[in-house]
Amino acid sequence: MKNKHSGFSGSLGFVLASAGSAVGVGNIWRFPYLCAKDGGGLFLLVYLVLVLTFGFTLLTTDVAIGRRTKQNALNAFGTLHKKWRFLGYLTFLVPTLIMTYYSVIGGWIAKYFAVYLVSDGTQAAQDGFFTSFITSQVSPIVFMLLFLALTAWVVYRGVEKGIEKYSRYIMPVLLLLVIGIAVFSLTLSHTDDSGVTRTGLQGLAFYLKPDFTGMTLRSFLNVVLDAMSQLFFSLSVSMGIMITYGSYVKDDVDLNKANGQIEIFDTGVAFLAGVMIIPSVYVFLGVDGMASGPSLTFISLPRVFASMGGVGRIVGIVFFLALGFAALTSCVSVMETLVANCMEIFHKSRKEMCAMVGVYSLVTAVTICLGYNVFYFELTLPNGSAAQLLDVMDYISNRYVVPVVMLILFLTSTGFWNLLFRH
């Protein structure tokens, strides 16, 4: 059957939906850690330069390809030129891999939100709570199912009535929640057992002040590489997502303006996440409390919330609600990309492809959940870290497939632009 091509109602819907895709858990649990690790303001400056140059070029290229071809990511490159068809398959591989585990992470967030909602949240700060949760065989699957069902419902509703409609509500609320916690974190003050008092403003200075201590050419290149990897992780480029969303954009939308707004929203939330997290962790745990990824979100921050006393529960609720919104909008964009591609591949309706992608997501996500117990193993990655099944899937997609596609896109961007705007 022939499917009518959906679309956003206008520029605002596209910007909010795309910002929702870009603003994910990586902005909140990875960006602040990299800032703390890589010299604070130095990392911010390097990242900003990359976003305004490299990132803007790739984002605009992705969206322009989608709008010009009105095709999903799988077919868009081949529509421009047969020799680039292979890029469509590479970009299709990325959301296929990410969808296997993103709803699992969403389930973790839902679990912690529920804990703070129904209790004072102190149990979340206890040693071993996170490990005990993810290694259980039932609870992670239940919360993953809830998150996946909500994601599938939004995608099933379609572009304008689902993705755009919910993004219009969720993204402003997400921004307000992040701003609220960021402002609150600056008011914090704590005196530890040794009598040392640390304040939120001192934590802000730690976050913003460039630290060149021990800086060498090699360490600076590491900062650049970290900033580049965060760029890959954050803007949703080279994953087929922005090509798919670009295919829904009306021809009268100013892409340069819209893409600039997306970058401002995405980078702004990442920056505010740093203001939200780094000062509060610094106040209660010091510099040594900084951690990356799940350790920061599900271990360090609950300890910070517990140290706040009664207000910690409220902050915990607001934080995990904001993180849940960020995870939901990103997961929706990943599933939408798969559904849009499958609608073209199999010539089936959105309803049928939502069901098929939903079953795929469910089976693979359950497998990922069981990777911490029934299918448990440890594999040493090239970077030396020990990885389970989720880590392996994330490593393959974000360390290999995405950078390769992004590099090819950047190197061939001149050719793409000649084809996109030839008369």
Question: Model-derived features: where do they sit?
Answer:
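Membrane-water interface regions at transmembrane-helix termini and the short interhelical loops
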Residues: L34-D38, A64, T79-L80, F86-P95, ...
